Amino acid sequence: MKRARRKPPTEGKHAVKADQYTGDSRYSEAAKAAVQATTARVREMHRAIAGKTFDVLEKIPLIAGPAALVRVTHDAIAGSVYTSIHHGSGSLLAATAAIERRLPAAGEDVTGSRIGSTLRSALNAGFGDYLAASGNALAIPMALHVEGRPVPLDTASLDAAYPSAGSRLAVLIHGLAFDEYCWLPGEGTGVDIGRKLEADFGHVPLYLRYNTGLAIADNGASLAVFLEFLLSAWPQKIESLILVGHSMGGLIAREACEQAAADDLLWPQVTTMLICLGSPHLGSPVERLGQAVTTALHSTDITAPLGRIAAARSQGVQDLRFGPKANPRTPHAIAMRFIGSTLTDDVDHPLGEWLGDGLVTLGSATAHPVTGNIRSARIGGIGHMALLTEPRVYAQVARWLRELAPA
């Protein structure tokens, strides 16, 4: 059956855009929204606390009348103060945003730097769905990055960015609130897994950057489309593709595999393995605790404004509560390998399962709802972020790849 023509990756719901520096605003608009939202929540809490106090005073004989008068005066003064803060900060930051729009080059230098990228990635983790929905230029579009800059998804750009482009690729996908720089080891410590994959197996490392605040399902669907166009745009015919995802990155890669199977995409045919490092397949206890705290804060009038602040965290963060589901009927020809770690040196220590790597429990990192060629490994004495550059983690990945390689 003839395959239907697909939309280019710059169109449709799951758009893939190379130019991440377009839009109407940058940091000032995001700061304006944050300041005004926080001011509103503080005002609500102030009103709730003061209201309960005045309610009690107005029920006491002799002082009820004066209390009511003080309440009117208090409410008028407080209201004018918060209104001034709201409009004053809004006007100042709106003016700053107007200046930013007139200086695009300066804005690009900031967002293109490593520090700027780190800040932008953190903003996207917390509010990325809002940034994307509001068209804010700080929303990160999915793209490969080389030296901090996006690479357009066309053959000429890929050929220029990867002069040693071969037929074997490894796409590395970072986790929540990070960018491609997280894969780099510290000075004198750890291994560069991307370079090791290229040196030992000939897989050219491609580093993906994306908006971690979007829903995991949406990012997975975007990645599925992205990989399909990478397959057709790469300068050489791709013979082998592996995906390496850390934390949320592994979940998004899993979602992409599900979506690719449902849509009959081509890239899974050349994809040999998906490797997940510390990915919370069954959810993260940290986000479940966050949800419990949010619910508790909503239980009283005084703390409800704080609950609304907590509830404003991005959909991507909230999706980590339980992890993505999987369709057991989805055929998976791709080998999937999961690595979980514990802070304790002994993975069988009673605290090992409970602590996990500090963010993800051992069970959530190694258990899964997926069917097919699945294997997992447990390694002790490694924290969540150390999984990215730990030599023992790479050694396990290398063993799996050698086992899967044809004789």
Named regions from a protein language model:
Residues 166, 185, 238, 271, ...:
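A broad structural signal for short, well-ordered beta-strand segments within beta-sheet-rich domains
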Residues 203-210, 376-382:
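Short glycine/proline-rich turn/loop motifs
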